[in-house]
């Protein structure tokens, strides 16, 4: 489990951006304050940031893929992603990586709430 809050925040941001692009209607409509100034919509869904070991993250990734959920959106963040300086480098490294070479440091999942809670219920919020 990563302890550095800056790294955790960065990983969570990357995962959230991908989820936001891949899940329709995750971001709600804009709102307006009393002066009429617009504030862009934010997510309607809770996005808890949970702590887990690399092994647990890989286990969760494999578990959700095994369920064959039709509307599953799953994005992972590996040490390869963390260490790559450019997207081209990331793509090259991923293309040559075997599954055993992939060590996940984060995962973002959008699926049925019941399935997520069942799989992650034992994990604690990062504080």
Region locations from a protein language model:
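Short, small-residue-biased leader/transition segments that mark boundaries at the very start
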Residues: 1-2
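Short, well-structured hydrophobic secondary-structure segments
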Residues: 8-60
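Short basic, glycine-rich beta-strand/loop surfaces that mediate nucleic-acid
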Residues: 42-51, 71-127
């Amino acid at each position: 489990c990563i302890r550095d809050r800056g790294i955790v925040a960065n990983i969570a941001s990357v995962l959230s951006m991908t989820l936001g692009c891949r899940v329709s209607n995750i971001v709600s409509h804009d709102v307006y304050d009393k002066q009429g100034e617009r504030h862009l919509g934010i997510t309607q869904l809770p996005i808890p940031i949970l702590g887990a070991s690399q092994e647990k993250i890989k286990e969760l990734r494999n578990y959700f893929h095994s369920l064959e959920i039709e509307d599953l959106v799953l994005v992972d963040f590996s040490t390869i992603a963390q260490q790559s300086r450019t997207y081209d480098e990331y793509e090259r490294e991923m293309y040559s990586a075997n599954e055993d070479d992939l060590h996940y440091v984060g995962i973002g999942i959008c699926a049925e709430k019941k399935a997520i809670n069942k799989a992650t219920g034992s994990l604690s919020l990062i504080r």
